[in-house]
Amino acid sequence: MKPTTEISGTIIWGEEFEVISGTLYIEDGIIVDLIEKQVSDDVIIAPCFVNAHTHIGDSVIKDPPITNLDELVRPPDGLKHRMLNKTPAVELINAMGSTLKDMKKTGTTAFIDFREGGVEGVNGLRQSLIDMGNLRSIILGRPHNDLPELLNVSDGIGLSGVNDMPLDVLQEIVSAVKKSEKPFAIHAGEKDKTDIDAAFDLEPDFIVHLTSGSSSDFKRAFDQDCNIVVCPRSNLLTGAGMPDIKGMLTSGAVVGVGTDNVMLNSTNMFDEMKFISTIFLQDDRQVFKLCTLNGAKVSNMDNEIGSIETGKMAHLMVLNRNSYNLQGVRNHLSGLVRRARPDDIIQIIGVE
């Protein structure tokens, strides 16, 4: 057993993200105690982010000209898929590795990736993860005539949408993944409503986007215990629209946040928080929850990460309260959501 370590400062504590002055005690990577006491206000200690939707594979083609959604990402002929198919595996693996390092540096402790390319695609991402310490991942593969083997090597299945393949093929995939008892997720309602009902009929664990969703769709998500993941920066960039995050939350559904395609957006969750806080919500506590605990719930990791509590893993980011950027912040949580940047981070704990 490693010796107990301690860290003191202003702590964003628990599932309600209460701002507490005190000391955390950590043993073998697990938070074992919190002692509330007045300590130096030099650092803010917060839970790391959970990025609930990424496409790490397209790290190899960052910032292409913005055309339209189908031309960029729709299989099989969208720009992304053409590039993935012709790029050597070693180049893809190196590009994904750079993105994963950037994730860690910017405060993300876990992510859910929709990984194209079948078994080879999943194995490539796993190879990129080898030297990434305790960065947690849920890799949802996309079948490429290799469904049985893919279910063995992936953590589940993530599909592009119900309109992108024949119904009988789709049903075969969904049946197999449900028998495997692994998670199944799908994009829906990104640019219009035509695929929303059919996606819900498949009973996925979560749906990505629902940008075109209505209150009845959000209620159906809640009723079916289907989580929602929004990608607002990506939606705005591609012209898909703006998700009704308030409506989703009002329905009671669990809503997580993802940065979506690396070709279009960095995996920096600080940017996503600022964007959501500015455009959609003025509730800083709720915004932070979307990007941390709710992402952990979507990934079924909320018993381990997503908030700072006894018994959970100590996946923490420590921010410099005295940085040029954070000097003068009076509300620590609001400063974290609206103002903080990756360069304010002094240390990332737990994902070394």
Question: Where are these predicted regions, by residue range?
Answer:
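His/Asp/Glu-enriched, well-ordered alpha-helical/loop segment
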Residues: D201-L202, I245-N325
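Divalent metal-coordination and catalytic microenvironments
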Residues: G9-T10, L24, G29, D42, ...
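Active-site core of metal-dependent hydrolases
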Residues: L135-S137, E149-K246, T250-M263
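C-terminal cap of metal-dependent C-N hydrolases
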Residues: L293, T310-E352
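Active-site loop-helix segments enriched in His/Asp/Glu that coordinate
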Residues: M83-S154, L159-Q171
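Short active-site segment of divalent metal-dependent hydrolases/proteases
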Residues: N51, I56-D58, E190, M263, ...
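Active-site gating loops and adjacent loop-to-helix segments of metal-dependent hydrolytic enzymes
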Residues: S59-N94, D197-F200, N227, I276-D283
